């Protein structure tokens, strides 16, 4: 069997790739591996608003109960709520059923350990090994030793209280627009901002099981950008389906992506003496403009591979407090152990409130270098072609020479989809747009 786990848990089209049988096996193996030797272990289970969540939850919970563990079901809550509540409730593990920003037909299963961190590759491999062994030596308890399913009704309330407590200030006087992507933030974000005193205006907060991420949320912020201006809001926030990421919109309707949010928060925290080692952790996909802004503000940058797990690894290894990605995955390690869209939105809103500056003013700390991202569709087994094909390698070198130190070419395979992402930065938008499309077309042609 090829590796089950991708960069963010197990993902696939629900009911064909990610089947109820696989969910049961993951629940059974995951509960066994993560709770070995624990007396009556407790595992949290939550989901986003996808229609397939009910089916997968039933199967996953059955697997957990089959090894004698308790399943504490939280219902629909954001992914970061699982990370936080696993710690807060003293659970042995947490599981989120979500495919994040992916379309509705996809779903995923992601595990957290007892500290609220995503699993290491070694633990994921051990879960897969147990499944492939046919559950060799895994107990099948009977009678009173079986696990029970418990519905935890206070989960959403507990998460909202935690998120609100991260800012310690009223947001009264702020007009805030929220795009909930018809996903897991549709209650948590709305209630948190309202309870903090903000006047809120909400779109895409009516999930029906099939409309999650559909032309809305952080992957499609255009509607929010217009809505913020129309409603004369001070700012807006767009979440993805499971609310582990967040993008902002300023009062003029401009998008404020993860790079801007990171730079704004890093500058503010540094001024308060709360940015550990004056260092911000980012990935290779962050805009060169962020690097320049940080240099001007005397903020160090630590650069990792793409993926919030690599950002987190660097933060934990060096004790850094802030890191994230352009996509809006922002980790405030003083608050949570994973990217948290609601916590991110609240930090930005509180900075606007405390400084008295508009979000448009705050984002002027950074100037974006034009950046183009083009997806090349490639089979999963050919994702490394850009490192192996001589013509593609030569074309990349030619483009790098043409950019002459004022830009860059970055190519990376997607961890969750049959895509290779081609990213170019440079001073001339039209030029890099053409170069990126040419390179993506070349990669696709070589694969077909």
Curated annotation (Swiss-Prot):
GO BP of this protein: carbohydrate metabolic process; peptidoglycan biosynthetic process; UDP-N-acetylglucosamine biosynthetic process
Binding site for Mg(2+): 100, 240, 242, 244
Enzyme Commission designation: 5.4.2.10
Cofactor note: Binds 1 Mg(2+) ion per subunit.
Post-translational modification: Activated by phosphorylation.
Gene Ontology molecular function terms on file: magnesium ion binding; phosphoglucosamine mutase activity; phosphomannomutase activity
Cofactor: Mg(2+)
Pfam families: PGM_PMM_I (PF02878), PGM_PMM_II (PF02879), PGM_PMM_III (PF02880), PGM_PMM_IV (PF00408)
Chain positions found as Phosphoserine: 100
InterPro entries: A-D-PHexomutase_a/b/a-I, A-D-PHexomutase_a/b/a-I/II/III, A-D-PHexomutase_a/b/a-II, A-D-PHexomutase_a/b/a-III, A-D-PHexomutase_C, A-D-PHexomutase_C_sf, A-D-PHexomutase_CS, Alpha-D-phosphohexomutase_SF
Catalytic activity reported: alpha-D-glucosamine 1-phosphate = D-glucosamine 6-phosphate
Active site residues per record: 100
Keywords: Isomerase, Magnesium, Metal-binding, Phosphoprotein
Role of this protein: Catalyzes the conversion of glucosamine-6-phosphate to glucosamine-1-phosphate.
Family of this protein: Belongs to the phosphohexose mutase family.
Protein name, entry field: Phosphoglucosamine mutase
The encoding gene: glmM
């Amino acid at each position: 069997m090829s590796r089950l786990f991708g960069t963010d848990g197990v993902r696939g089209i629900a009911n064909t790739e990610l089947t109820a049988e696989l969910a049961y096996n993951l629940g059974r193996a995951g509960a066994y591996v993560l709770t070995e030797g624990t007396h009556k272990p407790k595992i949290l289970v939550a989901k986003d608003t996808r229609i397939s969540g009910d089916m997968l939850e039933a199967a996953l919970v059955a697997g957990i109960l089959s090894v004698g563990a308790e399943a504490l079901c939280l219902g629909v809550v954001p992914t970061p709520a699982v990370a936080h509540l696993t710690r807060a409730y003293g659970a042995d593990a947490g599981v989120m059923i979500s495919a994040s920003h992916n379309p509705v037909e996809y779903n995923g299963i992601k595990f957290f350990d007892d500290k609220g961190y995503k699993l290491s590759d070694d633990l994921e491999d051990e879960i897969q090994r147990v499944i492939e062994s046919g559950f060799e030596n895994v107990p099948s308890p009977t009678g009173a030793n079986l696990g029970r399913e418990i519905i935890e009704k206070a989960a959403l309330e507990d998460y909202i209280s935690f998120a609100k407590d991260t800012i310690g200030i009223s947001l009264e006087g702020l007009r805030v627009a929220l795009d909930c992507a018809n996903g897991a933030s549709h209650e948590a974000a709305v209630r948190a901002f309202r309870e903090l005193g903000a006047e809120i205006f909400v779109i895409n907060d009516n999930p029906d099981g099939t409309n999650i991420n559909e032309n809305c949320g952080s992957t499609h912020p255009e509607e929010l950008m217009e809505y913020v201006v129309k409603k004369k809001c001070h700012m807006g926030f767009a979440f993805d389906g499971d609310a582990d990421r967040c993008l902002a919109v300023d009062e003029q309707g401009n998008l404020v992506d993860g790079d801007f949010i990171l730079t704004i928060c890093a500058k503010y925290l540094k001024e308060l003496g709360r940015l550990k080692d004056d260092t911000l952790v980012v990935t290779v996909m962050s805009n060169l403009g962020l690097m320049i802004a940080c240099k001007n503000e005397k903020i160090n940058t630590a650069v990792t591979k793409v993926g919030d797990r690599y950002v987190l690894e660097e933060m934990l290894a060096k004790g850094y407090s802030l890191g994230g990605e352009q996509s809006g995955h922002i980790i405030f390690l003083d608050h949570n152990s994973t990217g948290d869209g609601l916590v991110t939105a609240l930090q930005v809103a509180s900075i606007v409130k405390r400084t008295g500056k508009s979000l448009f003013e705050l984002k002027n700390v950074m100037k974006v270098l034009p950046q183009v991202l083009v997806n090349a569709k490639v089979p999963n087994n050919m994702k490394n072609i850009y490192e192996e094909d001589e013509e593609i390698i030569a074309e990349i070198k030619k483009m790098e020479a043409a950019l002459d130190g004022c830009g860059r070419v970055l190519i990376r395979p997607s961890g969750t989809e049959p895509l290779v992402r081609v990213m170019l930065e440079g001073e001339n938008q039209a030029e890099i747009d053409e170069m990126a499309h040419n390179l993506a077309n070349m990669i696709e042609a070589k694969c077909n």
